[in-house]
């Protein structure tokens, strides 16, 4: 699972200039051979490790690196 976690973090870092939040389906594309439930477990583990954070608009939940993006800057998060 550590290798999969690193793959997610590398993906997010490579996109940090354009986007800071991503849909769940963006991550399922990273792991085409895995079931959605397995991908969800990887993302949940990263959230629990405080590497990722959830962001919700009320109707949609997205994932991003903790402290990245305009929302974090507006809330003065580190």
UniProtKB/Swiss-Prot annotation:
InterPro entries: DsrD, WH-like_DNA-bd_sf, WH_DNA-bd_sf
Entries under SUPFAM superfamilies matching the protein: Winged helix' DNA-binding domain
Pfam family, one: DsrD
Gene3D superfamilies in UniProt: Winged helix-like DNA-binding domain superfamily/Winged helix DNA-binding domain
Record-stated family: To A.fulgidus DsrD.
Protein function: May play an essential role in dissimilatory sulfite reduction.
Protein name listed in UniProt: Protein DsvD
Species: Nitratidesulfovibrio vulgaris (strain ATCC 29579 / DSM 644 / CCUG 34227 / NCIMB 8303 / VKM B-1760 / Hildenborough) (Desulfovibrio vulgaris)
UniProt lineage: Bacteria, Pseudomonadati, Thermodesulfobacteriota, Desulfovibrionia, Desulfovibrionales
């Amino acid at each position: 699972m550590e290798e999969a976690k690193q793959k997610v973090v590398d993906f997010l870092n490579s996109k940090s200039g354009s986007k800071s939040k991503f849909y769940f389906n963006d991550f399922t594309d990273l792991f085409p051979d895995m079931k959605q439930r397995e991908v969800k477990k990887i993302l949940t583990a990263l959230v629990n490790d405080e590497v990722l954070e959830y962001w919700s608009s009320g109707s949609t939940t997205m994932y991003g690196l903790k402290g990245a993006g305009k929302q974090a800057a507006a809330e003065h998060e580190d």
